[in-house]
Every structure is written in C-alpha cells, then in structure tokens.
Amino acid sequence: LALGFSEEELDSIVPISKMRKLVEERTEATPDNRFYKLNPKVDDIPEKYGRTCNGVKLLVLGTVETANSGCVCPEHVMLKRIINNLVLHRDDVVILDMEAGLEHLGRGTTEGMDYFVVVIEPGARSVQTYKNVKRLAEGLGIHQVHVVANKVRDEKDEAFIREKIPAEDLLGMVHYNEQVIDADRQGCSPYDFSQKAVSEIRGIKEKIDKTNM
C-alpha cells in the first residue's frame, strides 16, 4: 500500500512460495520425488510475476510455512535463488522487505546484500533484536548494518535511542504520526498524508546514500 498499489491489486497477487505448480515445474519436486534441483531457472520470474507501480517493481516472494521443513525445501531453494539472481546478476537496486525476526538470517536468505536497515522502536527488546541482527549479518559478510527508529513519541524516546544506538549506525528517526496511522487505516500511501513523515524519510534516504558510497 505504501508504494501506491490498491488493496484490490495486492489481494490479487499470489506469492511465489504459494505457486505450487511453478515451484514443482522449476525444481522438479513432487510429493513422490524427494530429490529436486538446487539451481532452478528463475531469471524470468521478476518480469513474469512482478507488478509495477510508480516506477517500482514489486515481487512478492512469500514465506515457507511447511511445518518441520527445515532450511532446505523446494520453496526455500526457489526463493533463495530468486533473491540471489536479483542481487548478484542484475544491475538493479533491490530492496528486500523482510518479516520481523531473525529467521531469514539463520537461513542465509539475505546473503549477498550490501546494506541492512533495521527498523526498531524505542524499547529494550527492539534494541536487542538490532544487536542480534547485526551479529548475524556480520557473519554473512554484511557490515553495513544501520538503524531507523520508528514510532518515536517524545524527547525521552529520542534520548533512549541515542543512548542505545551508536551514532554512526543511526540513520534517523520517524516520529509517531497520527496522519500516518490514518493513512494506514484507509489503505492509502502515507506519502499523500504527512509531509513531516515524508521529510523524515527523505533525510534517512539521503543518509543511506552517503553511508553506502
């Protein structure tokens, strides 16, 4: 929704991980076949299944939800190959919006990325998550791990963030904003609702450009 897609457009998108026939076709995995390709063809998938809005192509990968599937299953192999193809074999800017948590790091799904932006809130558990993400990311060879503090309400929150996050890692803060909440309730992009939030995010983007040079 933040990109400008309508709810109807988003509801019509089927995540790649849910496209069972596609996964079986590319990996040659079936319920009766425990052996499958570890290097399925994926280079055509972004063009075939991506949706474009405002100059941004959105590809919904989905998650692997099979119980006890472990780290290696046909769906996971497929998703990891798609990400690797986008990151390593194309001259595009790729932004991965990952679910909160550490699972994607444990599976190595984000290996090959140049830059991590960890979105936290003013709280001890959120700060600890950032520390864990940074440690695991460095284990994957990713040393650019930075923080955006979200839903910052007041000076106490600001002081907490500045105390807990090293200045060189902090990209900026996005303050709690009722206009952004209203936009979310209406299923609209906050871009058209709050110039303050847009200004804060632009400042973060400019800092990313500087730290990623």
Residue spans for each PLM region:
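C-terminal lobe/tail of nucleotide-utilizing enzymes
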Residues: 136-213
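Switch I (G2) and immediately adjacent beta-strands of P-loop GTPase domains
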Residues: 42-62, 84-89
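Switch II (G3) loop of P-loop NTPases
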Residues: 61-67, 71-72, 83-105
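Anionic-ligand binding region
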Residues: 98, 112-116, 127-133
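Conserved beta-strand segments of the P-loop GTPase G domain that flank and frequently precede/overlap
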Residues: 60, 118-121, 147-150
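N-terminal phosphate/diphosphate-binding loop that engages ATP/GTP or pyrophosphate donors
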Residues: 1-54
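Inter-motif core of Ras-like GTPase G domains
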Residues: 81-90, 104-124
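Conserved nucleotide-binding/hydrolysis micro-motifs of P-loop NTPases
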Residues: 64-66, 100-101, 123-125, 152-155, ...
